[in-house]
Regions:
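Glycan-recognition and catalytic cores of secretory/periplasmic carbohydrate-active enzymes
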Residues: 1-199
Length: 199
């Protein structure tokens, strides 16, 4: 970890073009590691990483794009953890920035109703598995009431891309209802993790 809190494997000059999904992923994994290990170094590491992330985003030195934009909610796993521990306002502000810069999956619902047969962020099956937990990880931080929106999204996804085992079809992107379509393993894992946070 750098002195300023940065934790990703790139030099300072490259940060502006670095996809910060890595920040979101690393902090999510470290949160899970802490839950298993109770390693007291982790909360301080997470605090410093997220404070640095916040400062870079709020200053405009970096912005979400690519994976970071389409997986912004992943970062909120750690933001929730640190907020519960420290309760500082900048963590709620970070959540707002991530939501504002992140993709709104409601805009892609129309694309879930038929296989688009080409790769796109909004129908990427792993992104969708991750996305289901969005409301669960944002409500407390953003002061919003929980509406069970994940169920609405699930109903659309299941209706047009569902399987008998409650997963969605997709090798990279949603594949429709054909019984010959499978499901990418990463999507299974991410869907399970979303359900863990939802229920």
């Amino acid at each position: 970890q750098c002195e300023d809190g940065w934790i990703c494997p790139c030099c300072e000059a490259d940060r502006v073009t670095y996809d910060t999904w890595a920040v979101q992923l690393l902090t999510k994994v470290l949160t899970g590691y802490y839950e298993c290990s109770s390693d007291e170094r982790i909360p301080e590491v997470l605090y410093r990483v997220l404070k640095n992330y916040y400062e870079l985003l709020v200053s405009g030195k970096i912005a979400l794009f690519n994976w970071g934009k389409f997986r912004w909610f992943e970062g909120l796993v750690a933001v929730n953890f640190v907020y519960k521990r420290y309760g500082e306002q900048w963590l709620q502000d970070l959540a707002k920035i991530l939501k504002e810069q992140g993709a709104d999956y409601d805009e892609f619902i129309k694309d879930w109703k038929r296989p688009v047969n080409y790769w796109q962020w909004g129908t990427h099956i792993v992104n969708i598995g991750m996305m289901l937990k969005t409301e669960a990880v944002t409500c407390d931080l953003l002061g919003k009431e929980y509406t069970d929106h994940a169920q609405d999204l699930y109903d659309v996804l299941s209706g047009y891309n569902g399987t008998p085992v409650e997963l969605f079809t997709g090798d990279e992107c949603l594949s429709g209802l054909s019984p010959i379509q499978g499901t990418e393993l990463c999507a299974v894992v991410e869907q399970m993790y979303s359900y863990e946070l939802l229920y």
